[in-house]
């Protein structure tokens, strides 16, 4: 079930007697969806994915939910440690093997702005595309973390030891405060290798919000006088560039639209 709105605005803010014009087009859309039901025999239907990160359809859920593993945490709400990460006795992070919803690929809204300037046969236009909301799993970031080449593995040019704000389970089954120090390498090895080939999925879920300069184009249209001695009635020459500049992204240089192993562009 889909519900949404789409708004479009076309305007010409500037038009001069010399022939200069500025045309502006703004397109805004917002959509929400809900899966009403699946066949009774199916509770989870895979739409794509790889290893321990999958795109599942579930009754009552949204189309395009990202499912994967998450950090193991204290789930007992009556515990004073509720919500804290559970580590090994050596202080290493651990992950739950059961997949849960860790993200949703669907954006909250989309916005496109096209601006076109024209003067005496010349026209210059650019398109800015914006996507707000939604998440994406980045296998690229996970691979860089595993090899130690990601910026997150060497904050401010240093790899200091760390003690996670977490608890571990002692021999009596009770939670104890973690005081064990681990190296940066040990931390990322645990995060990227636990629970499957893609590691703890939650660790590499990023906001898919992005703003980009989608297109730049420059064109020249020959007027009829120039073509009067030719068999052509109209000629327009131009150059165009796509995906020119990622203005804003949360994915450390990875394009949120670059997708592998999912049939839903998640």
How would you label these PLM feature ranges?
Residues 1-5, 12-105, 136, 143-146, ...:
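Conserved small-residue
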Residues 2-6, 21, 108-112, 210-217, ...:
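Transmembrane beta-barrel architecture of outer-membrane proteins
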Residues 104-139:
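Glycine-rich, aromatic-lined ligand/substrate-binding cores of catalytic
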Residues 246, 250-266:
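Predominantly the C-terminal beta-signal and adjacent terminal strand-loop region
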């Amino acid at each position: 079930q889909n519900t949404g709105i789409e708004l479009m605005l076309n305007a010409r803010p500037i038009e001069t007697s010399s022939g200069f014009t500025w045309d502006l087009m703004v397109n805004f859309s917002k959509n929400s969806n809900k899966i009403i039901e699946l066949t009774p025999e199916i509770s989870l239907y895979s739409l794509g994915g790889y290893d321990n990160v999958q795109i599942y359809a579930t009754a009552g859920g949204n189309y395009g939910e990202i499912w994967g593993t998450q950090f193991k945490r204290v789930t007992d709400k009556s515990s004073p440690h509720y919500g804290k990460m559970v580590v090994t006795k050596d202080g290493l992070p651990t992950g739950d093997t059961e997949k849960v919803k860790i993200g949703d690929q669907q954006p909250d809204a989309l916005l496109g702005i096209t601006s076109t300037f024209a003067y005496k046969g010349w026209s210059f236009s650019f398109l800015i595309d914006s996507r707000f909301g939604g998440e994406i799993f980045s296998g690229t970031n996970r691979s860089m973390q595993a090899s130690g080449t990601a910026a997150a593995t060497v904050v401010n040019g240093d790899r200091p030891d760390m003690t996670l704000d977490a608890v571990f389970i002692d021999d009596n089954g009770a939670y104890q405060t973690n005081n064990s120090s681990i190296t940066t390498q040990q931390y990322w090895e645990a995060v990227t290798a636990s629970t499957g080939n893609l590691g703890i999925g939650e660790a590499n879920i990023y906001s898919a919000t992005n703003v980009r300069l989608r297109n730049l184009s420059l064109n020249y249209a020959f007027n009829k006088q120039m073509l009067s001695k030719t068999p052509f009635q109209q000629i327009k020459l131009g150059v165009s560039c796509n995906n020119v500049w990622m203005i804003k992204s949360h994915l450390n240089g990875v394009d949120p639209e670059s997708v592998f192993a999912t049939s839903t562009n998640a």
